[in-house]
Each structure stands twice: as structure tokens, then as C-alpha cells.
Design a protein with these regions (language model features):
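Short basic helix-loop element that most often maps to the first helix and adjoining turn
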Residues: 5-24
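Alpha-helical and His/Cys-centered functional microenvironments
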Residues: 22-24, 33-34, 67
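Recognition helix of helix-turn-helix/homeodomain-like DNA-binding domains
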Residues: 27-40
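Short, charged recognition helix plus adjacent turn
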Residues: 52, 62-68
């Protein structure tokens, strides 16, 4: 079962680049790109960091596929 992510949507709403988000989250731009394209599922730690940066619950950012 995969994960559906709203990282791209939330990042774009805020006018942030992948590089800006990556710097704030302490990861590479490639990691953010891989999360946004569904090639990489973030660790719990990274998911929580992103939730804090977006000021939104983690379950709003990430959902299991088929649970929408």
C-alpha cells in the first residue's frame, strides 16, 4: 500500500521552492522531489518535521492510498 502526499500542493501554496523546503527540513532537494513524486516515503521523523513546517497535521499531508 502506497502513500498519497500533498507536499507539492502545500509547498506551492506557500510559494516555497523544493530547495527552500529541503533546507528547512534538513534534507536534500532530491529527497523533497522524491517525496512529491511518490518515489520515496519519508520517515516518521521527516513527516513530523514537514507537518511542523507546514503547520498542519501529518495526516493532512500524508494518507495511505485508498483512504481518501
Amino acid at each position: 500500500m502506497g502513500v498519497i502526499t500533498r507536499v507539492n500542493e502545500l509547498r506551492s501554496e506557500r510559494g516555497w521552492t523544493q530547495a527552500q523546503l529541503a533546507t528547512e527540513a534538513g534534507v536534500s532537494r532530491q529527497t523533497i522531489n522524491s517525496i512529491e513524486t511518490g518515489r520515496f516515503e519519508p520517515s516518521l521523523t521527516l513527516a513530523l518535521k514537514l507537518a511542523r513546517l507546514f503547520d498542519t497535521p501529518v495526516e493532512t499531508i500524508f494518507q495511505l492510498a485508498g483512504e481518501r
